[in-house]
C-alpha cells in the first residue's frame, strides 16, 4: 500500500473544493448581470473541453499506464490502462443515459424561461440540479486523485473543471431564480451542487484509502481519463457550438489545449 502524506490529502481536497465552488460564480453572473454572453459561454465551454481532453490524454491516461506498469509490467500495464480508460467511458455513458444533459436548460428559447410556467420551471430546476450534482461526483474524484498523485496534473485539471463549472452554475441558477424569484435560493442551489465535488472526493478517498496501491491509482486514473474525455466531447463541445455565433468553439478548444500544454510544461520546471 502506498503512503500518502496527510498534507497532500488536504491540499487535494482544497483544490477540489475550489473547483467545485466555481458553480457559485456562475450563479452570481446570473443574479447580478442582465444575461450571460452566449459567445463568452461558447468560448469558455470549448476552452474547458479542450483543456480536459488534452490533460486526460497527455497526462492522466499516461499516469494510469505508468501506475499499472509499476504493478504488473510494461505490456500488461498498457493493456490495463487502455481497459480502464474504456471502462471510464462506459461508466459515464451509463450515467449520461439515465441523467439528462445539464447544459440543456441554458437555452434562452427554452420554455423554462417563460415567467408564466412556474411549475415547469420548478421541474427543470430540480432535474438540472440533480443532473449536475451527479456529474460533479466523478469530476470531484478526478480533481482529487489527480492532485493527490501529482499537483502538476491536478492543478490544471482543476482549473479546466472550474471553468466548466461556471456555466453549470448558470444552468442551475436560471431556472431556480425564475421559478422562485429568490436570489438566495438560486445561489444556494448552485453552491450545493458544486459541493458535490469535494464530497465525492472525500467519499472516494475514504473508500480507497485502505487499499491505495499502484494498481489502484492505475484504475482511478484510467477511469478518470475516460470520464473526462467523454464529458468534454459529449457535453462541453456540443454545448459550446450551440451558443457560438462564429468560431468561438474552435478558438476556445485550441486555447484550452494550448493553455494546458503550456501550464504542464511550466509545472515540470
From Swiss-Prot:
PANTHER family, sorted: ZINC TRANSPORTER ZUPT (PTHR11040:SF205), ZINC/IRON TRANSPORTER (PTHR11040)
Record's protein name: Zinc transporter ZupT
Organism: Stenotrophomonas maltophilia (strain R551-3)
Transmembrane segments: 11-31, 40-60, 80-100, 125-145, 158-178, 187-207, 217-237, 249-269
Chain's role: Mediates zinc uptake. May also transport other divalent cations.
Cell compartments where the protein resides: Cell inner membrane
Keywords, ordered alphabetically: Cell inner membrane, Cell membrane, Ion transport, Iron, Membrane, Metal-binding, Transmembrane, Transmembrane helix, Transport, Zinc, Zinc transport
One Gene Ontology MF term: zinc ion transmembrane transporter activity
Amino acid at each position: 500500500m502506498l503512503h500518502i502524506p496527510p498534507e497532500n490529502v488536504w491540499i487535494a481536497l482544497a483544490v477540489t473544493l475550489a473547483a467545485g465552488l466555481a458553480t457559485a460564480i456562475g450563479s452570481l453572473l446570473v443574479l447580478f448581470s442582465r444575461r450571460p454572453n452566449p459567445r463568452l459561454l461558447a468560448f469558455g465551454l470549448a476552452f474547458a473541453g479542450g483543456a480536459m481532453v488534452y490533460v486526460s490524454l497527455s497526462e492522466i491516461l499516461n499516469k494510469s499506464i505508468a501506475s499499472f506498469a509499476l504493478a504488473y509490467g510494461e505490456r500488461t500495464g498498457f493493456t490495463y490502462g487502455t481497459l480502464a480508460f474504456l471502462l471510464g467511458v462506459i461508466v459515464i455513458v451509463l450515467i449520461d443515459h439515465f441523467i439528462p444533459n445539464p447544459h440543456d436548460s441554458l437555452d434562452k428559447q427554452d420554455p423554462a424561461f417563460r415567467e408564466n410556467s412556474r411549475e415547469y420551471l420548478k421541474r427543470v430546476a430540480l432535474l438540472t440540479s440533480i443532473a449536475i450534482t451527479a456529474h460533479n461526483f466523478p469530476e470531484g474524484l478526478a480533481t482529487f486523485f489527480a492532485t493527490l498523485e501529482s499537483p502538476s496534473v491536478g492543478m490544471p485539471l482543476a482549473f479546466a473543471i472550474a471553468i466548466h463549472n461556471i456555466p453549470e452554475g448558470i444552468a442551475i441558477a436560471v431556472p431556480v431564480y425564475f421559478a422562485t424569484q429568490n436570489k438566495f435560493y438560486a445561489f444556494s442551489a448552485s453552491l450545493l451542487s458544486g459541493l458535490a465535488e469535494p464530497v465525492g472526493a472525500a467519499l472516494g478517498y475514504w473508500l480507497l484509502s485502505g487499499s491505495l496501491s499502484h494498481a489502484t491509482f492505475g484504475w482511478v486514473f484510467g477511469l478518470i481519463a475516460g470520464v473526462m474525455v467523454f464529458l468534454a466531447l459529449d457535453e462541453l463541445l456540443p454545448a459550446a457550438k450551440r451558443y457560438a455565433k462564429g468560431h468561438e468553439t474552435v478558438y476556445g478548444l485550441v486555447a484550452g489545449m494550448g493553455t494546458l500544454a503550456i501550464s504542464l510544461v511550466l509545472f515540470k520546471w
